[in-house]
Every structure is written in structure tokens, then in C-alpha cells.
Amino acid sequence: EGTHHKKISTLFEKLSETPGSRIIVNMPPRHTKSEFASYLLPAWLIGKNPKLKIIQTTHTAELAVRFGRKVRNLMELQVYKDIFPDVDLRIDSKAAGRWETGQGGEYYAAGVGGAITGRGADLLIIDDPHSEQDALSETAMEGAYEWYTSGPRQRLQPGGSIVIVMTRWSLKDLTGKLLKAQGSDVMSDQWDVVEFPAILPSDKVLWPEFWKKEELLRVKASLSLGKWNAQWQQNPTAEEGAIIKKEWWNIWEKEDIPPVSYIMQSYDTAFSKKETADYSAITTWGVFKPNEGDPEAIILMDAQRGRWDFPELKAKALQEYNFWEPDMVI
């Protein structure tokens, strides 16, 4: 049991006492978000309120039905019946993804994009609405949001609550879209957002009982920085919309650096040698004309990156400055 499990439990206890809750929990892969949100939570809430109507969704119908089967099987255990003696499953409605309680409660599982018309929900659970393939497609991301707004969100009954648990993928994923809507319209759903990065700002691991820091660092080394920050640190960055566009850049095919009229050197510094610390970076740029008559352009002449403590960084900066003799330092 990790500290994040205790925080999630407290969050869900508050949910059970607060009609109309809007909760988003962003967590890294393999940190038991589904175990809590799509297994324990619905079983516990139906035990407390056997009339509860739940719609459970995830990125595939197969996975959503699997969650439904797990919840149903848990409710059929004697230990569950001992704790919640006032709830039972209807014998004639016990399909894995579509079952009812004898007291009028309902559970309905659907994949993202699936039809849920004719269903009402006191609780909507959305667990990882995006697959890895969806994350590569802006169209798929947009489709998931459109499905949410036109489908599940419209099935919520007065006083109904929404729980979204997911790993972040980009600023255009469901969390990103909902937070953007929240910021642009005060009448839109206002979300309580809880983010759990795999490695905390304190440099400690979120769940040390399960994940060792060395293992997480190996995961980090195997991913691009953007994917690590999004999926594991819950901190996605913009893929586009930057002031300087990726497509503006070309590769300088010649071996020698062209003559430059002006040299700029920039520093982005950190002061730690820890493996999880940010890098310090020193880049040197030159202003030049690619061809006679062309407008001026800039070229990256040198780049240095490393984790240096302050004395090392100072020495490295002096070395780079003396070598390139820049006209400007940023």
C-alpha cells in the first residue's frame, strides 16, 4: 500500500458523501489506478447504495466488460455479502458487463465510442479513455472528447458524479480538453484534479514499495522526454504551437560551419548531479546567410548538456565562452 492509495481512498470517501462530484486522477502506468477506480470503488459504492446506477467506460469494450466481471464476482463472494448484507444481484441479469442488483441498481460497461443511449448514471467512471494507438492520433483524441460530451456526459442524472482516472498523453487528451473547457467557461464542470508523478518533486518515488527508483530511471531512459513527462510525470507539453516551429529547421549538410556575422551563447542551468535532476545546457548559435542574397538565418554551432554541480558548471561555462567568444550571452 502506497501513500497515493491512501489519498485516493480519502478522495473516494469524499465522493461518496458529495453529490455532483467531478474528480480527475492522473497517474502513471502500473500504479493500480484501475484496481481502485474500476474495481473497488464501484463494488464499495453499490454496497453502500444498492440502487446506484453506474456506467463504466474505458478505451475498449472488452476491458470495460472485464472490469464489470471483476466487480460482479467480488459481490458474489461471501465476505462481501457479510459486509454488505442488504445488496444482492438479480439472477436474471448477471452478464459480465451488464448486471443489476435486486434493489434496482445497475452496472453498464462500454468502450469509448460505444453506444450508451437509454442508460442513466448516478456515477460515471472513465478509466484510461485513450489507448496507446489513440495517443498517436489527434483525430482519435478529438473523437474521444466528442464521444464523452455527446454520450456519457449526457447520461448523468441530477446529482450524479464523474470519476476520471487516466495516464496523461498530451495536452489534447481528455483531461486536457476538460481542463481547457473549465478554464474558458465558469459554468462548465469544475474538476478536482489530483496528479501523481512517478518521481515526486522531492526526488522520492511515488510508490517505493513497488517501484524502485533505478527501475523508473530505466523506463525514463527508454522513452523520449516528452513521453516520460506526460505518461509518467503527468506533465504533458505542447507538441505544436511553439513560437519556433520544428519545420523551420534544416540540417546543415556541409562539414564546416559557415562564416557567421554574430555569435550568441545561451545557458539553461541547473545545479545538481542527481540522476533525476534536470540537465544544464549550453548552446552556441551563429547568424549567417545560407546563400548570397538570402535573409539572415541562425545555425546551431555547438551544444553541451550535462549534470554539473555549480563549480563544474562555472568552469564549463567559462571554457565555452573563451572558445567561442560570443557577442551576446543569454
Regions found by a protein language model. Give the residues of each.
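Nucleic-acid-processing active sites and adjacent nucleic-acid-binding tracks
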Residues: T283-I330
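Conserved nucleotide-state-sensing and coupling region of NTP-binding domains
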Residues: T57-G113
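Conserved RecA-like ASCE ATPase "motif II neighborhood" in helicase/translocase motors
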Residues: A96-S150
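ATPase catalytic-site recognition across NTP-hydrolyzing enzymes
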Residues: D203-T269
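Pre-P-loop entry segment of helicase/translocase ATPase cores
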Residues: E1-R22, D268
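An active-site-proximal beta-strand-loop segment
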Residues: Y267-S280
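Walker A/P-loop
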Residues: G20-L41
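ASCE P-loop NTPase helicase motor core
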Residues: T139-P201
